[in-house]
């Protein structure tokens, strides 16, 4: 069982970071394998987002608010896929949720973005003031999927891409980033690594 988990984690890392140096992830992989002993392996092809959910998100004023709500929805749908009794609750640390949603700015600004979503009636907070849990109130578990989410990196940018803005998926690692020119094919990290490889190849040709 442990070798299977390790292989799946390594495959996931290499899909999202084709040029990863695996020795840098040794400790992280070992910790993940150890933690996985408590839960069975569960593979998901994608998280399905319905048109009704997207319509609910579009009702919220502000693009950053929509990005954050979309990200929270994706996390809630994932949680439901692995635990049908989750009832829309997510427990991901807020700092991680903001990062996944590509919501930038001060902590006060980020808190204000979440408060706007709460005041719009799309999320619910727990009674405990010190809890980071959030309940997403717009989950549609029966509708036909309009969008399939297979990558939880840059979910905010994925939402903006769905909205028709100038974002694209890197041809090498699949990361969704902003398109600054029509010629862009790669994210910055992959472009830098490809350029380094080309430079090494040219050096060997000249040697």
Report residues per predicted region:
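Short helical patches
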Residues: 127-129, 162, 202
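Short metal-binding segments enriched for Cys and/or His
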Residues: 192-207
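Short Cys/His-rich metal-coordination motifs, predominantly Zn2+-binding knuckles/fingers
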Residues: 170-176, 190-193
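Donor-sugar nucleotide-binding helix/loop cap in glycosyltransferases
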Residues: 159
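Cysteine-rich micro-motifs
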Residues: 181-194
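Short alpha-helical "packing" element that flanks the helix-turn-helix/winged-helix DNA-binding module
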Residues: 67-75
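Residues immediately within or flanking Cys/His clusters that coordinate Zn2+
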Residues: 165-168, 184
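Modules that initiate DNA replication and primer synthesis
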Residues: 1-65, 81, 86-88, 94-156, ...
């Amino acid at each position: 069982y442990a070798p299977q988990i390790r292989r799946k984690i390594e495959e996931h890392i290499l899909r999202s970071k084709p040029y990863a140096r695996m020795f840098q992830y040794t400790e992280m992989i070992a910790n993940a394998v150890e933690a996985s002993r408590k839960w069975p392996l569960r593979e998901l092809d994608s998280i399905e987002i319905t048109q009704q959910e997207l319509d609910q998100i579009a009702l919220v004023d502000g693009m950053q608010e929509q990005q954050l709500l979309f990200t929270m929805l994706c996390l809630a749908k994932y949680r439901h896929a692995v635990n049908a009794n989750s009832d829309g609750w997510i427990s991901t640390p807020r700092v991680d949720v903001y990062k996944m949603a590509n919501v930038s700015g001060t902590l006060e600004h980020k808190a204000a973005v979440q408060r706007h979503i709460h005041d719009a009636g799309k999320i619910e907070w727990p009674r405990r003031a010190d809890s980071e849990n959030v309940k997403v109130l717009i989950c549609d578990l029966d509708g036909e999927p309009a969008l399939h989410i297979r990558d939880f990196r840059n979910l905010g940018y994925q939402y903006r891409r769905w909205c028709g803005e100038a974002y694209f998926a890197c041809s090498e690692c699949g990361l969704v980033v902003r398109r600054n020119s029509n010629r862009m094919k790669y994210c910055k990290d992959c472009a830098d690594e490809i350029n380094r490889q080309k430079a090494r190849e040219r050096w060997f040709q000249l040697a």
